[in-house]
Amino acid sequence: PLDMLAALMGEGKKSIFYKNFVKSEKAIQANVGHPCRELSGEFHFTVLTFPDWQEDQGIYFNNIEADIRNTIAEWEEKGFTDEDLEMVKTEMISQSFDMKTSISSKASMISSWEWKGRGKHNVSTEINRYKNVTRADVMRVFNKYIKNRKAVINQVRPKSPFVKELDSLISRNPNANLILKEDPQYDNLIYKKSNSEFDACCRHTQPEASAPKTPKIPEFHKESFENGLKTIFSQTNEVPKVYIRLKINGGSLFEDSKKSGLSSITAQMMNESTQKKSSEDISVELQKLGSTVSFSSEDDMTVLLIECLSENYSKTLDLVEEKLLFPAFNDEDFKRIKKSNVEGLESMKKNSQYLAGSAMSNVLFGDTPFGRSMTEKSIKKIKVKDVKEFYNNYSPNISELVAVGNISKDDFYKELDFLRKWKNKNISIPTNFEFPEDNTTQIYLLDKEGASQSFILMGHKSNTYDTDGEYFKSQVMNKSLGGGASGRLFLNLREDKGFTYGAYSFYQGNKQTGMFGIQTSVKTEVTDSALTEIFSILDNYTNTGLTNEELSSTKESYLNSAAMKYETPNQKLGFLN
């Protein structure tokens, strides 16, 4: 019932917390959650507001707690309908299937039920847990655990850039002078070591690994529509759901250099109102179906992800058609999204990895879509008409659709008539960008005031993406260098020197760019020593290459991990894409 209560209060754009905080532009996010544990539970109300000192907004939010408590009281007063309750039940049942798509998640679920005393795990039993929740159950837990209850309140406020010195104490640790008393139940406690060959902490003898198994490649059907849209479908009956990924190539490659972020903002606007329905109404319809439909933007593409129960596939695609082909691009939605993006950038400026990544991209790829980053200045230059013009780059001739699901091929394709009718605009994707020439080794310093450690990111341009060429071979080579906890970088900088919690190297690439990188966060005082070690490891690896043991371990790792490479629906989507 507490899960249901959290969903009723804060799930979706029609929820009271979304309406009172996000829709009203008081906050960037407002969430209600119930992170239940084995021996205890918590119920969270989390609101990420805009700072009080945003003077140009003329609105101040000094008492977040009062706003939250007033919203809770308003929810109780207005109540919820039986339709609302059925809606969140369907949504939770749909989400529960996602937890059973891999061997790992199934094993975790089965063991969790067992050691929490629930007995043997049964899918039908779990679904019935949600189905059997009543209105009385929801209100009972609300009255018992939420209404008029005390709470631990944690407010984190940013320092105002307009105030040089703080005139009052704004942070207090309630446990600063707490004296811990020893619990008498632990007096005279003696550790008794287990004599078992397999005890709770380890095996004494490492089990023999079985021979690698050839992965089972999913069967699939390919079909191209007359308007240029390419599709791939694979039937899988693991869970009663359908997963679809529509990739519209281009993304930020179409952006004006002075309006970086236009691709992202357009994708966010696609998640809002349509010409027929408000974003709140669409959110409710999707929740009723237990479906998810979301647009997002990456460097060189816009992605539409769709998840739905097989039984609701047709109704979900009706909403997809409306969102894809008939967006509204309302001024009200646009204003809120721009404001949220500006504040999001302010937050990202506190993230060392974001700052380093943005700087590295600019150094490697210069004034191109791959080197530019969204800024407050570029966001403010974007107008609604720019979004509408950018939307015209969405065309089937540069798009690919991949789907896997518990549905027949015929049933899948018969619902795609709206995509067959999607107008081909004969869009061409920009290519042949000019990147800066590679220079000798250079060091760039970014000063982040108050940083507790140094984030190191080093790299250079490298191969573009491929499945079995130089890019793939580079990935294999990188495994022993820094591809995981067994890599030389990790073993040296963490295990041997104790400079960091982790150090890794990586390759990443797409159709037009690629890079090799090394990253780690180290204690500030050992920054120079860490760099010395990294260069030493690179020199040694370049001169001597992999050892026979490392090569054997790399092969085993790739071969053994391949057995489950196409297990889950999302893994199948990635492979077919």
Where in the sequence are the language-model features?
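Charge-rich, well-structured scaffold segments of protease-associated domains
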Residues: 1, 24-203, 281-428, 496-497, ...
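His/Glu-based metal-binding/catalytic segments typifying zinc-dependent metallopeptidases
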Residues: 1-14, 46, 180-204, 224, ...
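Thiolate-centered catalytic microenvironments shared by cysteine-dependent enzyme domains
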Residues: 21
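Edge strands and adjacent loops of beta-rich recognition modules
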Residues: 204-216
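N-terminal post-signal-peptidase region of extra-cytosolic proteins
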Residues: 213-218, 246-249
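Short pre-active-site segment immediately N-terminal to the catalytic Zn-binding motif
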Residues: 252-258
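Active-site SXXK
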Residues: 261-274, 285
